[in-house]
Design a protein with these regions (language model features):
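Metal-dependent nucleic-acid phosphoesterase active-site entry motif
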Residues: 1-27, 167-199, 245-249, 253-254
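Non-catalytic, alpha-helical, charged scaffold/linker segments
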Residues: 77-222
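Extended charged low-complexity segments that act as oligomerization/scaffolding linkers
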Residues: 1-7, 28-115, 316, 322-330
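Long, positively charged, glycine-interspersed low-complexity recognition regions
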Residues: 23-33, 40-41, 68-70, 75-78, ...
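A short secondary-structure junction motif
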Residues: 15-24, 49-68, 100-101, 178, ...
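Conserved glycosyltransferase catalytic-site signature
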Residues: 11, 15, 48-52, 272-279
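Long, positively charged binding patches that form subdomain-scale interaction surfaces
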Residues: 192-277
């Protein structure tokens, strides 16, 4: 059977398509996607990030009161995505990264196998309206966690800002490489501690009233669950010290986009964290990847589209038209 093409859709694309006028540009895109999905030519797996963002969107109207109609609208958008996802969903970032790492350690490279990146999961069909009323509360707590995740990158940005002058292109390239490299430190330190202790203690990050696992510890725990022993841990330390994340697609994408923001003096926001995780999860395996224009430009600056042979699209009119043409030819 011929391999299906993969289209990664972000929240903005879904919200623009779900009730678009059929003759509009977004309506045409929706129509061609539904056609190709039903013909089993195209697959549009749902990312976990879609669920995070759906739950996190405030259900309060302009007057500050609960808006049932707005809640229904968000639920309808989720239902539309569920219909085209056909029960397929992307794995989370740490799961994908752990799988890529183990393949690299055992086989010497990371092959783009679809089952490594997405699978059948119940949350693609979840009735979102039942739990949406408390979603905005989750989002507030999640923002505390996101602040922990990107505080180091924002610190790097401030250090570079204090260093003074605007970097030339060669200097930016060197700075990008450097910032990607230093993001390996926490993982190398964690692996060395794993080798010493023989186990992983998953620390919690306090996020308002809830406690969320530390991302480094969580990845190491998943690696141990996938039978990472001391020999493989030492091999991974050597890999990270020598090549950084270069051979691990999800981690390479994530660290590159984090570094790009720091080099260009941009402060990360909770939405940036979600968007970067979206790219880390879906960019490598997708044939077509939808992102906001800023992230599209960042992906292209880092040449990640070329490295992983993925076509990037944004909500700009000419970009949407180009995607419609591309999908029509499948």
């Amino acid at each position: 059977m011929k391999r299906k093409k993969i289209l990664y859709l972000d929240q903005f694309a879904v919200s623009n398509m779900y009730n678009a006028v059929p003759t509009s540009l977004w309506g045409q895109l929706r129509s061609i996607i539904i056609e190709k999905v039903n013909n089993r030519i195209l697959s549009c797996p749902m990312p976990l990030e879609h669920l995070y963002e759906t739950l996190g969107r405030s259900n309060m109207g302009e007057d500050g009161n609960e808006s049932i109609e707005y809640s229904k609208q968000i639920a309808q958008q989720h239902h539309f995505f569920s219909e085209i996802a056909k029960g397929t969903t992307f794995y989370g970032y740490e799961e994908i990264a752990a799988t890529e790492i183990m393949m690299l350690l055992r086989q010497g490279n990371v092959k783009p196998i679809q089952s490594m990146y997405f699978h059948k999961a119940y949350y693609a069909d979840i009735e979102i309206l039942d739990i949406y009323a408390n979603g905005h509360k989750f989002n507030k707590e999640n923002h505390f966690y996101n602040q922990e995740l990107f505080k180091d990158v924002n610190g790097l940005r401030e250090d570079m800002k204090k260093a003074g002058q605007e970097l030339s292109k060669p200097d930016k390239s060197l700075a990008l490489d450097y910032l990607c490299k230093i993001q390996t430190r926490a993982y190398i330190e964690g692996l060395k501690e794993l080798c010493r202790k023989g186990e992983v203690n998953v620390r919690g990050v306090q996020c308002g009233k809830i406690n969320i696992p530390n991302k480094v510890d969580l990845l190491l725990k998943l690696l141990c669950d996938k039978k990472l022993d001391k020999r493989l841990a030492q091999k991974l330390i050597c890999e990270l010290e020598t090549h950084g994340f270069e051979k691990i697609p999800s981690m390479n994408i994530r660290s590159s986009l984090n570094a790009d923001m720091a080099v260009n003096g941009k402060s990360q926001t909770p939405n940036d964290v979600i968007d970067i995780d979206r790219a880390a999860i879906g960019l490598r395996i997708s044939d077509y990847f939808f992102a906001d224009n800023e992230k599209k430009l960042a992906i292209e600056r880092c040449q990640l589209d070329k490295k992983y042979q993925t076509k990037i699209y944004s909500a700009k009119k000419d970009s949407v038209s180009s995607l419609i043409t591309e999908l029509s030819e499948l």
